[in-house]
Each structure stands twice: as C-alpha cells, then as structure tokens.
UniProtKB/Swiss-Prot annotation:
InterPro entries in alphabetical order: GlgS, GlgS_sf
Pfam families listed in its UniProt record: GlgS (PF08971)
Function: Major determinant of cell surface composition. Negatively regulates motility, adhesion and synthesis of biofilm exopolysaccharides.
GO biological process: negative regulation of bacterial-type flagellum-dependent cell motility; negative regulation of single-species biofilm formation
Gene behind this protein: glgS
Assigned protein family: Belongs to the GlgS family.
Protein name: Surface composition regulator
C-alpha cells in the first residue's frame, strides 16, 4: 500500500467519524450526497466506517445521558 492510499484512508476515516458525530448531535447528514462521487469500493468502505462510528457515537451519547 502506498503512502497516498494510507493518507486517503485516514482522511476518509476522519470524515466518516466527523459526519457520524454530526448525526449523533442531531444535525442532518445526507450520506448519499457525501458519497455520491466515490467509486463503489470507497463508498462501501466509507459507509461501513460511518455506520460503525454512528453506533459508537449513539452509545456514547446514551451513556452520557444516563450519568
């Protein structure tokens, strides 16, 4: 794997985490618009990461509200 690909994945991961946090805060996120220009491989990877981070953010928010 070349360095450009690693940086690209890190950037996509950061974006997926950021959009998930926005979603958990109640801000609408149009994931179709976000991923619209991605090729299928990157879109699939991004959506899986986004779903994971949405789940984590929702759990964290729920725990925060319990305490």
């Amino acid at each position: 794997m070349n360095n450009n690909n690693v940086y690209s994945l890190n950037n996509f991961d950061f974006l997926a985490r950021s959009f998930a946090r926005m979603q958990a805060e109640g801000r609408p996120v149009d994931i179709q618009a976000v991923t619209g220009n991605m090729d299928e491989e990157h879109r699939d990877w991004f959506c899986k990461r986004y779903a994971l981070y949405c789940q984590q953010a929702t759990q964290a928010k729920r725990l925060e509200l319990e305490h």
